[in-house]
């Protein structure tokens, strides 16, 4: 079935409404309409010459980027004038119809995968069972953040509201945030705890606009006792997302519900963050987590080894802790690599054994999408066409999800660009795949080690091709 011009423009409007401020969208975008699509040339009608000139000058690149992302093919956007455009313009219809009343359609291969009607899926905490207070190692770098998180978990809505955790990648912000959720659910199993990233919030907002279900979206996010929001820095520049989050924040805060936020920097350092949001993020407690010192790193490795049933000599722990100093994720990754290597090689666990594979981290070589494709295909024994195609066979589907996950985390490709690489898949499909792999990573140590093995092979390939 062909995708109609109406459907393309409606979907684009949903994305533009999230990206732009409400006044901008209402004044300039909502009054325009897609007139025709001929030879990959999309014509957009505006109600006046002034509006046409303004869109062309200020928003042409944004509109072009969005419609190409939605269509999955290169499009050229042109603006024309129609005095009836503002009269006929309507908000996105959301309903999906097989035919269009206007000229032009997209090939069936660019199907958008939209759902008709419905509401957001039932909320679930989605907390990693490993992220508890009992498994969190306290040190000088995180003592204040840990104490604040405990206070919030014990008395949500009364201690520090909001609690804003900030610090670099892999320092334990997500661990502490989810530990609050676990603590509260153990104390009160009926508590409504919701953990979400700002990226997920934005995508849910786009879906709500698309389905005309904003009321359901608001109930979904505002009917909670504790809202845990990760990666807040990604809200920067998203005007409508910030506006919706502002009202969600106010509703929860005024109701005495607990809000916990995490970002890689403090609120006032997040660029293009609305001043009113920055003010609210700062009205509770901002707790910074810094890189762990040598004693804390050694304690983290000991606890990790203890929980995973690993027997590590003291000098091995000291060597890893001395070699990897920047963050906990890197530290634990080194431990997993060392254990995997010893298990595969049959050699004894010693500094001499693991030293060759745990050299001090150097400047990483660029990993490309093609490298990831080659390594994943080799690992799973499948061909490139199958991986990049649409086969739903379980082994191919999982390999594809892993490849998408690796591209998201080890390349600079955006979600839409990754979708394009896999034959024009929607960015929500890519996001789902990444979340699925993250979930498997949390649930299975064996899967986590397999993933780490793939990453190591990627680094070897990247280094060999750059030398």
Swiss-Prot record:
Return the InterPro entries for the record: AAA+_ATPase, Chromosome_initiator_DnaA, Chromosome_initiator_DnaA-like, Chromosome_initiator_DnaA_CS, DnaA_C, DnaA_dom, DnaA_N_dom, DnaA_N_sf
Q: Which family does it belong to?
A: Belongs to the DnaA family.
Listed name of the protein: Chromosomal replication initiator protein DnaA
Note down the stretches annotated as region Domain III, AAA+ region. 126-342
Its main localization is cytoplasm
Q: Cite the binding residues for ATP.
A: 170, 172-174
User: What does the UniProt keyword field contain?
Assistant: ATP-binding, Cytoplasm, DNA replication, DNA-binding, Lipid-binding, Nucleotide-binding
Q: Where is this region: Domain IV, binds dsDNA?
A: 343-467
Superkingdom of this entry's organism?
A: Bacteria
Region Domain II: which residues?
84-125
Q: Which organism is it from?
A: Synechococcus sp. (strain JA-2-3B'a(2-13))
For molecular function, the Gene Ontology terms on record are:
ATP binding; ATP hydrolysis activity; DNA replication origin binding; lipid binding
What CDD domains does UniProt report for this protein, alphabetically? AAA, Bac_DnaA_C
Which stretches of sequence are listed as region Domain I, interacts with DnaA modulators?
Answer: 1-84
- Please provide, in alphabetical order, the Gene Ontology terms of the cellular component aspect for this entry: cytoplasm; plasma membrane
- Identify the stretch(es) annotated as Disordered: 89-108
Q: How does it assemble?
A: Oligomerizes as a right-handed, spiral filament on DNA at oriC.
């Amino acid at each position: 079935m062909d995708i109609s011009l109406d459907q393309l423009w409606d979907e684009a409007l949903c994305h533009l409404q999230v990206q732009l401020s409400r006044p901008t969208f209402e004044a300039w975008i909502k009054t325009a309409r897609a007139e025709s699509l001929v030879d990959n040339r999309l014509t957009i009608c505006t109600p006046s010459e002034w509006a046409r000139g303004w869109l062309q000058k200020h928003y042409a690149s944004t509109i072009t980027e969005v419609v190409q992302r939605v269509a999955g093919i290169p499009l050229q956007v042109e603006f024309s004038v129609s005095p009836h455009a503002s009269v006929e313009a309507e908000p996105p219809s959301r309903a999906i119809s097989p035919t269009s009343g206007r000229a032009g359609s997209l090939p069936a291969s660019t199907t958008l995968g939209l759902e008709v009607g419905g509401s957001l899926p039932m909320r679930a905490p989605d907390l990693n069972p490993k992220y508890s207070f009992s498994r969190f190692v306290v040190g000088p770098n995180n003592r204040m953040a840990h104490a604040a998180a405990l206070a919030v978990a014990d008395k949500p809505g009364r201690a520090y509201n909001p609690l804003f955790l900030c610090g670099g990648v892999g320092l334990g912000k997500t661990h502490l945030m989810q530990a609050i959720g676990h603590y509260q659910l153990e104390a009160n199993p009926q508590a409504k705890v919701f953990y979400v990233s700002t990226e997920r919030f934005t995508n849910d907002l786009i879906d709500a606009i698309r389905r005309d279900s904003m009321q359901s979206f608001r109930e979904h996010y505002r009917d909670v006792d504790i809202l845990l929001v990760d990666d807040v820095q990604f809200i920067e520049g998203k005007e409508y997302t910030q506006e919706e989050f502002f009202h969600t924040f106010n509703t929860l805060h005024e109701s005495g519900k607990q809000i916990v936020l995490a970002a890689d920097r403090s609120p006032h350092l997040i660029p293009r963050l609305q001043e009113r949001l920055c003010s609210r993020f700062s009205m509770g407690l901002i707790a910074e987590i810094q890189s762990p010192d040598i004693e804390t790193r050694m304690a983290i490795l000991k606890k990790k080894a203890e929980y995973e049933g690993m027997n590590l000599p003291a000098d091995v722990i000291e060597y890893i802790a001395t070699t990897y100093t920047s963050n906990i994720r890197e530290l634990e990754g080194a431990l997993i690599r060392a254990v995997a290597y010893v298990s595969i090689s049959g050699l004894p666990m010693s500094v001499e054994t693991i030293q060759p594979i745990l050299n001090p981290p150097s400047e990483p070589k660029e990993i490309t999408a093609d490298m990831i494709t080659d390594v994943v295909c080799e690992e799973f024994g499948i061909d490139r066409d199958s991986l990049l195609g649409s086969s739903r066979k379980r082994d191919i589907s999982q390999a594809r999800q892993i490849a998408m996950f690796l591209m998201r985390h080890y390349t600079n490709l955006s979600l839409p660009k990754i979708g394009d690489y896999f034959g024009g898949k929607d960015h929500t499909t890519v996001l789902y795949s990444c979340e699925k792999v993250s979930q498997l990573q949390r649930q299975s140590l064996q899967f986590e080690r397999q993933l780490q093995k793939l990453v190591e092979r990627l680094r070897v390939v990247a280094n060999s091709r750059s030398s």
